[in-house]
Amino acid sequence: MAQGQRKFQAQKPKSKAAAAERSRGPRKGGRVIGPKKARVVQQQKLKKSLEVGIRKKIEHDVVMKASSSLPKKLALLKGASKKTGATPGKTPS
């Protein structure tokens, strides 16, 4: 028999969201565990920045090529994250 009480009893989650999260079970897909060694972390950071730079360069080249071949100027659309609250059709009063 055990000597004394258990220190940490299993408790039910207080909120519904936490209870649902717990009962959902394991998620699909693989897990990505980051490296511990500083040198490998640095290499991955460098690799990521190079990949981003290369991708931006390729996108820029494609846009320049497309805009030079079109008779009308090519308009680029940026993400909708810049619009914060203000709707384009209405003016504040």
From Swiss-Prot:
<dbReference type="InterPro" id="IPR019034">
    <property type="entry name" value="UPF0390"/>
</dbReference>
<dbReference type="Pfam" id="PF09495">
    <property type="entry name" value="DUF2462"/>
</dbReference>
<feature type="region of interest" description="Disordered">
    <location>
        <begin position="1"/>
        <end position="41"/>
    </location>
</feature>
<protein>
    <recommendedName>
        <fullName>Leydig cell tumor 10 kDa protein</fullName>
    </recommendedName>
</protein>
<comment type="similarity">
    <text>Belongs to the UPF0390 family.</text>
</comment>
<feature type="compositionally biased region" description="Basic residues">
    <location>
        <begin position="25"/>
        <end position="39"/>
    </location>
</feature>
<comment type="function">
    <text>May have a potential role in hypercalcemia of malignancy.</text>
</comment>
<feature type="compositionally biased region" description="Low complexity">
    <location>
        <begin position="7"/>
        <end position="18"/>
    </location>
</feature>
